Amino acid sequence: AEWISTFRKAGDSILAELYKTKKSKNDKASEINKRIKEYREGKIANLNTVAKSESWDNQTLLNEILLLTYASYIVMLEYRNKVWKYEYMAFARRIGELWEPFCKLAFDFPIKKLTLVDPPDFDEVQTQIKNDAIGYIESLDLSEEIKAELKRHYDIPWTMVDSGGIKLGLDLHFEQNGIHYNCDFKSGFSSNEKGNTNRLLLVASIYNSLGEIEKNILFVRQTEDENNHYL
């Protein structure tokens, strides 16, 4: 309640300024979202400073940041609605947009030690897989002619792969205790998501081929009977 009150005061100030302008409702909505986000980031920075000076533990800091952020989302939705009424689909989509960064806070301010990492480059992964396969073929007790034929057949499917079109980057990648976690966040499912589902299956299969240190996680907001067919 305290954080909601704090953000509503900021929202009132922003709204008072916007009502004096001739901006469109679209521009006013964007400005509200932008200004409240900036205000929230400033408050989070202040919390970090206080946490260090008062030696907060990670759990205490994360809890306060989650409360602060949740309050900012409530006010952001309220004040955007004051200048431009939400339609049902626009509201549902906006909730999905806010859900992912809210979940990521637990990884940006972790309780247990972890390291955010960049996803691997597909060309490098492809080279590694090819080298492993060729090394295995070379180790077989076969004639050079048969080995060459095996390599030729092995190369055929790779010629059908457009390396530039396969991006291994998901919504979140982190390393913890020697394990690489590759995570994607899905709020809901709509008719245009089938291609994305197929991509996720492809990317997950590539990570699985890299060995036991790769773990894939899919975070979903809605259950299957509530419009999430990723499950």
Question: For each predicted feature, which ranges?
Answer:
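Conserved catalytic cores of phosphodiester-cleaving nucleases, focusing on short active-site segments
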Residues: 107, 170-188
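Active-site metal-binding core of divalent-cation-utilizing nuclease and nuclease-like domains
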Residues: 118-177
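Active-site-adjacent loop/helix micro-motif of nuclease/hydrolase catalytic cores
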Residues: 189-199, 227-229
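Structural beta-sheet core signal
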Residues: 182, 218-219
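Surface-exposed cleft-lining segments at the edges of enzyme active sites
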Residues: 86-92, 155-161, 184-192
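Nuclease-adjacent, charged terminal/linker segments that flank catalytic cores
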Residues: 1-110, 119-121
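Domain-level recognition of nuclease-like catalytic cores that cleave nucleotide substrates
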Residues: 220-231
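Short, charged, amphipathic alpha-helix that recurs within catalytic cores of restriction-modification
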Residues: 194-210
